[in-house]
């Protein structure tokens, strides 16, 4: 059971529901009269369409050593997006924290009697949230870049039951995803999924997710599992569209690299959602 098993498809062309969203792949009707003829030097409409379609096809293939820099770039950019999302967007989901910040603002007025300072209090609190979100997420990124993302071949390509894929468009790596075996419960974990921000909305993430599911099915795993701290609902809808079911949540989750200091706990909170796609019963 290995990602380079001969029976497995190592390079897969995307066939996704969002196929029309990939620029240049939607074919327009062309009506040609019987009097129109193409010379040997002219390109027929079908040939032109075929050339455009081929240029815009996205392929999922196994990671190669030459992909390393692009993979790290995509992963790094995806993680950095979580800083403002966690600091500001995430607050909408944290009712208790909202009340706490409101209480601190009121106490600021009670203790100082200063309207100016009270007016500034919410901005100070948001600034502190951004600072600690950046601090925690940069620590998490550093941990990842010095563990599995430092040596993808050793962590994902060599071990039995694990693999790492990249999505390639026009010769450029535009997306990544990994699968890691969990032999204790015969499941595989979907990890490190990220798509270049310039190529989102084209069905690439869904195709990467399907590749992991296909890998799990071919290797007779009972389920695919994943965990996400994503704040944006689009990420959760993606997993649900692939058939995953949310099976639990961990409030106030501790990311690798966190110190759990009082100020860090006050200004950084994140929810960890657990998803599972059951493939077959044990």
Curated annotation (Swiss-Prot):
Q: What is its main location?
A: cytoplasm
Q: Where is the chain membrane-spanning?
A: 103-125
Q: Which InterPro entries match?
A: Acyl_CoA_acyltransferase (IPR016181), GNAT_dom (IPR000182), NAT_camello-type (IPR050769)
* The keyword Endoplasmic reticulum belongs to this UniProt entry's keyword annotation: yes
Where does the record place it?
Answer: Cytoplasm; Microsome membrane; Mitochondrion membrane; Endoplasmic reticulum membrane
User: How does this protein lie in the membrane?
Assistant: Single-pass membrane protein
**A GO CC term attached to the entry:** mitochondrial membrane
The alphabetized UniProt keywords are: Acyltransferase, Cytoplasm, Endoplasmic reticulum, Membrane, Microsome, Mitochondrion, Transferase, Transmembrane, Transmembrane helix
User: SUPFAM superfamilies from the entry?
Assistant: Acyl-CoA N-acyltransferases (Nat)
Instruction: Give one GO molecular function term.
Output: L-aspartate N-acetyltransferase activity
Pfam families assigned to the protein according to its UniProt record, in alphabetical order: Acetyltransf_1 (PF00583)
Q: Cell membrane: present as a keyword of the record? A: no
Provide the family line: Belongs to the NAT8 family.
Relate the protein's function as given in its record.
Catalyzes the synthesis of N-acetylaspartate acid (NAA) from L-aspartate and acetyl-CoA.
**Protein name in UniProt:** N-acetylaspartate synthetase
- Gene symbol here is nat8l
């Amino acid at each position: 059971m290995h990602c380079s098993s001969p029976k497995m498809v190592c390079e897969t062309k995307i066939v996704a529901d969002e196929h029309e969203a990939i620029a240049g792949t939607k074919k327009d009707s062309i009506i040609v009269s019987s009097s129109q003829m193409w010379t040997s030097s002219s390109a027929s409409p079908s040939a032109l369409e075929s050339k455009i379609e081929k240029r815009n096809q996205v392929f999922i293939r196994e990671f190669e050593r030459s992909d390393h820099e692009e993979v790290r770039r995509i992963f790094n950019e995806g993680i950095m997006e979580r800083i403002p999302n966690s600091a500001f967007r995430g607050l909408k989901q944290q009712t208790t924290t909202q009340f706490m910040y409101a209480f601190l603002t009121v106490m600021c007025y009670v203790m100082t009697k200063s309207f100016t300072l009270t007016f500034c209090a919410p901005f100070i609190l948001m600034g502190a949230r951004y600072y600690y979100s950046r601090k925690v997420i940069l620590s998490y990124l550093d941990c990842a870049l010095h563990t599995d993302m430092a040596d993808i071949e050793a962590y994902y390509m060599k071990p039995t039951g694990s693999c790492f894929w990249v999505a390639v468009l026009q010769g450029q790596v535009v997306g990544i995803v990994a699968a890691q075996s969990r032999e204790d419960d015969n499941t595989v974990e979907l990890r490190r999924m990220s798509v270049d921000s310039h190529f989102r909305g084209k069905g690439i993430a869904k195709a990467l997710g399907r590749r992991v599911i296909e890998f799990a099915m071919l290797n007779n795993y009972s389920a695919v599992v994943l965990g996400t701290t994503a704040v944006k609902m689009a990420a959760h809808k993606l997993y649900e569209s692939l058939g995953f079911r949310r099976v639990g949540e961990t409030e106030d989750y501790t990311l690798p690299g966190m110190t759990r200091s009082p100020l860090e706990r006050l200004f950084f909170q994140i929810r960890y959602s657990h998803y599972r796609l059951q493939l077959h019963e044990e």
